[in-house]
A protein has these predicted regions:
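Beta-strand-turn-beta hairpins that frame and shape the catalytic cleft
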Residues: 2-8, 83-91, 117-123, 215
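Active-site neighborhood of phospho(di)ester-bond hydrolases with catalytic His/Asp-centered motifs
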Residues: 9-11, 30-38, 57-61, 124-129, ...
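Active-site environment of divalent metal-dependent phosphoester hydrolases
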Residues: 16-17, 39-44, 65-67, 82-85, ...
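Binuclear metal-ion centers of metallo-dependent hydrolases, dominated by the metallo-beta-lactamase
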Residues: 57, 69-82, 164, 168-215
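Active-site-proximal loop/helix segments of hydrolase catalytic cores
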Residues: 102-168
């Protein structure tokens, strides 16, 4: 994402992702990296990208901050419920219902999502999560959303039907689907997923890797 000229990366998983073979992680440039949790398919390229972007700031829950501060990265710790103002806008860390560990299975803190409140738009990035009633707190505590980025692959996270309900909970009409088709456990039927959203008057956007959109 890009807000106020700053490039924000979330959960970088490129190496080992068969759908992203056209992307060279060594060529990625960013100003911030936001991590929702520590699972391998969300941090696979973190250290390479951080090395190539030494001024980039890693933002995550306390345990993620502690792990990567020890590795020499610039970090900013957050925890759920808190806001912090960055140079592109302010961000709130919010609840996610999932698990979180580093690749060595050590504790990576609690999984989380983020709400980005910026002059260019308001975006909710849920991270990996199940449907939760806590999502109803987002429109009560945050500005109206322009876009929600929600997982739809089922098995490890919400499926499209639950994600469409999540879109109702957070009061957002445009949803960018994520966490689907990367491997066999989370392959989906695209038409069925789109129908789950359209039946609730919501738009589901299924982008190809390397694509871009404006909101």
């Amino acid at each position: 994402m890009e807000f106020s000229g700053k490039r924000i990366l979330t959960d970088p998983f490129i190496s080992g992702n068969s759908l992203a073979q056209s992307i060279d992680p060594a060529g990625i440039r960013c100003d911030y990296i936001f991590l929702s949790h520590g699972h391998p398919d969300h941090i696979a390229d973190l250290e390479l990208i951080a090395k190539n972007n030494p001024d980039a700031v890693l933002v995550g829950i306390w345990e993620i901050h502690a792990r990567y501060t020890e590795k020499g990265m610039k970090t900013h710790p957050m925890n759920k419920g808190g806001w912090w103002t960055f140079d592109f806008g302010r961000v709130k860390m919010v609840q996610a219902v999932h698990s979180s560990s580093f690749p060595d299975l050590s504790y990576a803190g609690s999984p989380a999502g983020f709400v980005f409140d910026t002059p260019d738009g308001v975006v909710y990035f849920s991270g990996d999560t199940a449907l939760t009633m806590d999502m109803k707190l987002i429109p009560m505590t945050c500005p109206p959303l322009d876009l929600a980025i929600l997982p739809i692959g089922s098995n490890f996270t919400m499926d499209a039907h639950d994600a469409a309900l999540a879109a109702e909970f957070v009061e957002c009409d445009r949803v960018l689907g994520c966490h689907y088709d990367t491997f066999g456990f989370i392959e989906i039927n695209h038409r069925e997923a789109e129908a789950a959203f359209s039946s609730k008057g919501k738009e589901l956007i299924l982008m190809k890797v390397g694509g871009h959109m404006e909101f």
